[in-house]
Amino acid sequence: SKNISNLSGRIGLKKNLFEKISERSLNSKDASGIKEIANEYHMGVSTIHGAESFYEFLRPAHRAKKAFVCNGSACMCSGTQEPLKKKLKEKLGDDKVGEMFCLGHCYENKAFHYDGENYAGNDIDKIDEIIKGDKIEQEKFFSKSFASTSFLMDDKLSNLDQFKDILSKFINTDKQEIIKSLLDSNLTGRGGAGFPAGMKWDFCGKAKSEKKYVICNADEGDSGAFSDRYLLEDQPLKVLFGMIICGYVIGSDEGVLYIRGEYPKSIEAINGAINSLKEEGLLGENILGTSFSFDLNICIGQGAYICGEETALIASIEGRRAEVDVRPPFPVTEGLYKKPTVVNNVETLAAATGILINGADKFSAIGNKKSAGTKLVCFDSFFNNPGVYEVEMGTPMKKVLNDIG
């Protein structure tokens, strides 16, 4: 795998190997395309085919379907999916309806995917309009903060003018001062492992390498979770700001968001935000007249749940089979293309932004030293108040479930 990483890294993130494999598989039935990719990267055809065959969305059986019913736990438990599947089969044919795992519409159920878009709730009643290609009005998830200070749902970074002012401040701030803020805040990774975010950035910053990377793990695959969807679609500037500042701190000039293919609106929102930042000179070469340059790319996942694990995600971007690597070495010393890499999930990056804007002391004052700050929680349609909410760490589950949910 090290050879594949190095060969893939020679071309890098722009039109990366995984993207090329995906495009060939989704847009062409001609097997000669695999040979062309293999030749370009000096790899064997079997290596490229092995990577391609790993992903559900790239398999011929999947590509032959027209619609996909969500089989995430919230939708399955709701009892809505069998009648939904029956109706889709009546419209499209028995062999044209497949399944996808959690489309992030747990708050309304009856979720399905058709022609690159997700639908849920009462959308199935407009299936004829959807098939014709008409745009329909869709339900939006409800969101609210119950925190004394909101770090994830406030509007302090909701437009490009705010973004420019805050970015100008922090890319002219001492890097160690930013790391100290994160360490003082007691922010731990929101992806599950709970590793101190400031420590991860510090380790990567101290690693010796001419090239480093920032990765946003947006492959939110846990059924019932749609908090990343909220941040990517409603707070994209918070997430991107976190990536840019991380790049500044560790000495990286390039980052990538790995967003699951089941979230088309998230991909659209992030693409739009990146393009807007580039147009304003807030991404790219010599940002705001400084010596700091940073660019962002998007990788679209192709239906592999394991890619939520950081080493499998790195393998995927490199064009390898998305299998978990043994650690150590950890990504901060040997990550993407064997270069030092920070991998943070969506909520961690957004929280880092909130800390820099609001202050580390306010964040650390919430919860305790092991679990400080605020956290997003999701309620599915079985709750009286389905949606995504920001709560303070240390809030009793009884209050979260009974009073908020």
Task: Describe the residue ranges of each PLM region.
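Feature of Fe-S/electron-transfer and energy-metabolism proteins
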Residues: 1-405
